[in-house]
Amino acid sequence: MRTSFDVIVIGGGHAGCEAAAAAARIGAATALVTHRFATVGAMSCNPAIGGLGKGHLVREVDALDGLMGRVADAGGIQFRMLNRRKGPAVRGPRAQADRKLYAAAMQTAIQGFPNLSVIEGEADALLWQDGRVSGIRLGDGREFAAAAVVITTGTFLRGLIHLGERSWPAGRIDEAPAMGLSSSFEALGFKLGRLKTGTPPRLDGRTIDWSAVEMQPGDDPAEPFSVLTPAITTPQIECGITRTTTATHEVIRANVHRSPMYSGQIQSTGPRYCPSIEDKIVKFGDRDGHQIFLEPEGLDDPTVYPNGISTSLPEEVQRAILKTIPGLERTEMLRPGYAIEYDHVDPRELEPTLQTKRLRGLFLAGQINGTTGYEEAAAQGLVAGLNAGLSAGGGDLVVFDRADGYLGVMIDDLVTRGITEPYRMFTSRAEYRLTLRADNADQRLTDKGLALGCVGVERSAFHHDKMSALSDAKALAQSLSITPNEAAKHGLALNRDGQRRSAFDLLSYPEIEWAQVRAIWPELGKVDPAIAVHVEIDAKYHVYLERQTADVEAFRRDESLGLTDVDYAAVPGLSNEARTRLERHRPHTVGQAGRLDGITPAALGILAAYLRREQRKRKSTG
């Protein structure tokens, strides 16, 4: 086996798989280090991909030729478009997945890269020299050299599981933690913190009374995540919905002192938007019930994931809770829920490229950066792996900004503001939601991926054909026009102003759909239905997109004003508070400075004026 690589990725979870694949796609000799290859692509918590905000990230990963979308399509057993009744900007694709099918598809994808090796073992230490990473050492003493290293340890970094009054070191149930790497981080001076997450008990679906719960089917037809998936062929299933009861709440209140979160056993912070059932009852005790989604974990696996009752209460209390929930009174618990604490690095230690500021060539992605969720991890993994490969090859690193995609929003939030709790993506975090839609991720990012060399031949050809078809369809819709009187004959009530309106103009009306304009102009029938959807969305948002484009241009102007080498003591007019905050955080651009707490518009104006003066000075002396 070779002992030297361009890029080494530590961890085979969602971040690690995307990082290794991204580095390999741009030609880097890559190694993926994981405890066991059999666990690569494992879904540690819920058996689902996507959702509100998260589905956008999956589509963006796919647009850059990442793996998650195609793997979820291969393993998905129920697909739903969340927020379907709302506007396209906030719709979120989501899929239930068969755990075995998902992991198998991911492992097959990883094995498909000829320049990607898998090394089984525990990464125990980082190696570095002269301020740059040089490789890693495994627990068995083996050493591997690399020009760049990506760390994606998930919950394994000094992981500690809590179940009732018991606790023990683990990275996941029945899997050992990663202990040594934290020592390397501390030796390098990284600021570490502790975070917590949890998971619910697993149930035997054969013992659930499905007649007592509401059944929820998926969408028909199912809409894939990836543009390269022509159709979903995996058999589809239904999920169940039930609720907690007042009896459930009484059991929890009587035993809440035995929860590690309330006994003082756990001191770290958990995800605000994925609270334990104990938290729900303590904080929202006035509710008469909390919804629970019963999600099958596989087509040939009886295990059911009860989404909504994450808990670390003692095992016997969990059984008592289940007996109070409709449909679960006689269910058998296959495995208790638990909480897990783990180390994370303050993400303000990172550049927007996800390279660390302290050690060149070292990149971090996923829960180690303080995020929660498979999709957040995958998006970071892709960016970190891509930049690790570029770094190893001596190329310029790439930054995805807040106007590029949700992955840019997330990374900017992390490296600019840091975190006080596990970070989860929501559509509300993005300023430019109208342009950053799940349906146009490929239109926004695939060309950028092509320029970076991370998009393969198949996607490149598909993208070229799609963009050509979209351009032709828009041109056709804009070339066909009608008067208000003519429109009235087709049942369309327009302002009788005598102005001709194109088919594209008509589609901008909220109440007019593609089928109606196609009935007027039969030639629109030749447009592929998938392309027609894009044309209609673009028309609906056209006026708003023009305004948002102006906002993005202003944002990009601020982002182009670099602050990397500024001596803030030499900037006249800055307040002491602003100067202190800027020195502490060292923002890269004026735009990033504006997103720091305590930096006023006046301070930004002073900075921008100072930079322009300095630029003029350099030009006059150059």
Curated annotation (Swiss-Prot):
Keyword NAD: yes
GO molecular function: flavin adenine dinucleotide binding
Main subcellular location of this protein, as a coarse class: cytoplasm
Binding residues annotated for NAD(+), in chain numbering: 270-284
N-terminal signal peptide: none
Translocase is among the record's keywords: no
Example of a GO biological process term: tRNA methylation
Cellular component terms per the entry's GO annotation: cytosol
Keywords tagged on the record: Cytoplasm, FAD, Flavoprotein, NAD, tRNA processing
Subcellular location field: Cytoplasm
UniProt-annotated binding residues for FAD: 11-16
Domain of life assignment: Bacteria
Co-factor requirement: FAD
NCBIfam families: mnmG_gidA
PANTHER family: GLUCOSE INHIBITED DIVISION PROTEIN A, PROTEIN MTO1 HOMOLOG, MITOCHONDRIAL
Job of this protein: NAD-binding protein involved in the addition of a carboxymethylaminomethyl (cmnm) group at the wobble position (U34) of certain tRNAs, forming tRNA-cmnm(5)s(2)U34.
Subunit structure: Homodimer. Heterotetramer of two MnmE and two MnmG subunits.
Name the record gives this protein: tRNA uridine 5-carboxymethylaminomethyl modification enzyme MnmG
Organism of origin: Rhodopseudomonas palustris (strain ATCC BAA-98 / CGA009)
